[in-house]
From Swiss-Prot:
This is Single-stranded DNA-binding protein 1. Keywords: DNA-binding. Residues 122-146 are annotated as: Disordered. Residues 1-104 form the SSB domain. GO terms for molecular function: single-stranded DNA binding. Transmembrane segments: none annotated. The keyword DNA-binding applies. SUPFAM superfamilies: Nucleic acid-binding proteins (SSF50249). GO terms for biological process: DNA replication. One of its GO terms (cellular component) is nucleoid. CDD domains: SSB_OBF.
């Protein structure tokens, strides 16, 4: 028997971190995962999947992920039930994460802002070293030019 779930999507809200009575950290969040097909209007629909993660990974998720973050989740599907205040049986299906991959840098906006500020300072005639930040060269600046690679240099 196999119970394994692999998902890639964006968080719909900031993670919620709490601690169990036994002292174990638990983080929960919802992941929006696009379906591979489109509906009749040609739009992609998404599934909103509840995720829970424990211990140190729960702390890391709470620290490094936020609403809109892209994450990969590898875990197992779990269904649990409880009785609510009205005495009704409630069933909850969620993914218990074994590992979570942070698929984009935490400070993407900050990095882009730094690059923009460096470029603006350079165009005003200031030295690129005046702000003591490393210069971020664009490795794809000449992407529209053909790349000269000898067939013997290819690994396949």
């Amino acid at each position: 028997m196999l119970n394994r779930t692999i998902l890639v999507g964006r968080l719909t809200r900031d993670p919620e971190l709490r601690t169990t009575q036994s002292g174990v950290n638990v983080a929960s969040f919802t992941l929006a995962v696009n379906r591979t097909f489109t509906n009749a209007q040609g739009e992609r629909e998404a599934d909103f999947i509840n995720i829970i993660v424990f211990k140190k990974q729960a702390e890391n998720v709470n620290k490094y992920l936020s609403k809109g973050s892209l994450a990969g989740v590898d875990g197992r599907l779990q269904t649990r039930n409880y009785e609510n205040k009205e005495g009704q049986r409630v069933y909850v299906t969620e993914v218990v994460a074994d590992s979570i991959q942070f698929l984009e840098p935490k400070n993407t906006d900050d990095n882009q802002q730094d690059l923009y500020q460096q470029q603006a300072q350079q165009t005003r005639g200031q030295s690129q070293y005046s702000n003591n930040k490393p210069v971020k060269d664009n490795p794809f600046a000449n992407a529209n030019c053909p790349i000269e690679i000898d067939d013997n240099d290819l690994p396949f």
